Amino acid sequence: MKKSYRVKREKDFQAIFKLGQSMANRKFVIYHLKGEHKHFRAGISVGKKLGNAVTRNAVKRKIRHVLMELGDHLKTEDFVVIARRGAEELDYQAVKQNLHHVLKLAKLLEEGFEIEKKS
């Protein structure tokens, strides 16, 4: 993900947490706030309770990959994805389905967009 698509600064994270809205499912929480950018910006937070650094980085890589894949269909808002316990056990397809579900609940995806389900 390009740097311009990332939320990196602490004050940006805090603004999204304080002023934004949240939506959650069992594996992920999303806080989102309307931004003044031409594209979405995403921050990813994976707590130490999920496992060691290798495990946490693997979860972040999966989330980043899903966001890049869905990038053309995301609305221009700033958001933070927080991984909950159990997210470390998910394979890529499950991460994609769970993120799609919570992004849809938060109304951050374009209307009518659905992911293809593999059988």
Curated annotation (Swiss-Prot):
Protein name: Ribonuclease P protein component
Protein family (similarity comment): Belongs to the RnpA family.
Statement: the UniProt record of this protein carries the keyword RNA-binding: yes
Entry keywords, A to Z: Endonuclease, Hydrolase, Nuclease, RNA-binding, tRNA processing
A Pfam match: Ribonuclease_P
Function: RNaseP catalyzes the removal of the 5'-leader sequence from pre-tRNA to produce the mature 5'-terminus. It can also cleave other RNA substrates such as 4.5S RNA. The protein component plays an auxiliary but essential role in vivo by binding to the 5'-leader sequence and broadening the substrate specificity of the ribozyme.
GO biological process: one example: tRNA 5'-leader removal
Organism this protein belongs to: Streptococcus equi subsp. zooepidemicus (strain MGCS10565)
One MF term in the entry's GO annotations: ribonuclease P activity
Lineage: Bacteria, Bacillati, Bacillota, Bacilli, Lactobacillales
Catalytic activity from the UniProt record: Endonucleolytic cleavage of RNA, removing 5'-extranucleotides from tRNA precursor
Subunit annotation: Consists of a catalytic RNA component (M1 or rnpB) and a protein subunit.
CC per GO annotation: ribonuclease P complex
EC number per UniProt: 3.1.26.5
